[in-house]
UniProtKB/Swiss-Prot annotation:
Organism per entry: Escherichia coli O157:H7
Family that this chain belongs to: Belongs to the GHMP kinase family. Homoserine kinase subfamily.
Protein name as annotated: Homoserine kinase
This protein's pathway: Amino-acid biosynthesis; L-threonine biosynthesis; L-threonine from L-aspartate: step 4/5
EC number(s) from the headed UniProt entry: 2.7.1.39
């Protein structure tokens, strides 16, 4: 039996639309991510468990984990009879890389079960392909950090899909999921087809400056450059209370904040534990909309997807 855990991730990080993402893990030790188990069997089966299992498609062939198994078998050129279990702990359409968690855990578990026939680059390419079936286009800003850990910059040149960017140990990521769903496809459809020249220049300056600040170890500058001129101005209308929440967390002391992925999760970066706690308390009282919402104080998950049992 192989059991794989794949962590939540926060894509875009305001400054890097479709090209930056970070894997995150709660500071209290809770596992924020999906788990997939693979066991040898006579025929294929898929069992869904976990807090959000009831939100998955009722038709098994529509389940992305089934599609991962099917695509993996196609890649190897043979049917691999296994019993798979998906522990769906991540809310769907949350902006926390929920589909990436399932895809990464499923493909990594299959690869481990079969003795690692695929290398990490090929596996990551498959992960992007499968996750793209849900989001509507192939992009790696959730699957790459989820699989490899840390903060990842998408390269997609010279057979390199992504590479790690050094993060800051003192940064605490407060993630607030309000409990409503925003589909990635809907959030992409709301964006303009073309952008003004000054927005393109500002975006390039922010992203280049952010990467420079990470490598030159300037956390205050990096946080200051986490600005979004590409998606947030258009997407915030999908997120009730988002603008007020951003203003409130800044007043409490967050050094940066924005939309996690395509939303509705809000991320707020803090450089002190007491500030992070106050931000989390405010968001818990004011940004959550129902019982399914939650707030976690996280750090970068530098390990990425990992085998829990083998």
């Amino acid at each position: 039996m192989v059991k794989v855990y794949a962590p939540a991730s926060s894509a875009n990080m305001s400054v890097g639309f479709d090209v930056l993402g970070a894997a995150v893990t709660p500071v209290d030790g809770a596992l924020l991510g999906d788990v997939v188990t693979v066991e040898s069997a006579e025929t294929f089966s898929l069992n869904n468990l976990g807090r959000f299992a009831d939100k998955l498609p009722s038709e098994p062939r529509e389940n992305i984990v089934y599609q991962c198994w099917e695509r993996f078998c196609q890649e190897l050129g043979k049917q691999i009879p296994v019993a798979m279990t998906l522990e769906k702990n991540m809310p769907i359409g949350s902006g926390l890389g929920s589909s990436a968690c399932s895809v990464v855990a499923a493909l990594m578990a299959m690869n481990e079960h079969c003795g690692k026939p695929l290398n990490d680059t090929r596996l990551l390419a498959l992960m992007g392909e499968l996750e793209g079936r849900i989001s509507g286009s192939i992009h790696y800003d959730n699957v790459a950090p989820c699989f490899l850990g840390g903060m990842q910059l998408m390269i997609e040149e010279n057979d390199i899909i992504s590479q790690q960017v050094p993060g800051f140990d003192e940064w605490l990521w407060v993630l607030a999921y309000p409990g409503i769903k925003v589909s990635t496809a809907e959030a992409r459809a709301i964006l303009p087809a073309q952008y003004r020249r000054q927005d393109c220049i500002a975006h390039g300056r922010h992203l280049a400056g952010f990467i420079h600040a990470c490598y030159s170890r300037q956390p205050e500058l990096a946080a200051k450059l986490m600005k979004d001129v590409i998606a947030e101005p258009y997407r915030e209308r999908l997120l009730p209370g988002f603008r007020q929440a951003r203003q409130a967390v800044a007043e409490i002391g967050a050094v940066a904040s924005g939309i996690s992925g395509s939303g509705p999760t809000l991320f707020a970066l803090c450089d002190k534990p007491d500030t992070a706690q106050r931000v989390a308390d405010w968001l818990g009282k004011n940004y959550l909309q129902n019982q399914e919402g939650f707030v976690h104080i996280c750090r970068l998950d530098t390990a990425g997807a990992r085998v829990l049992e083998n």
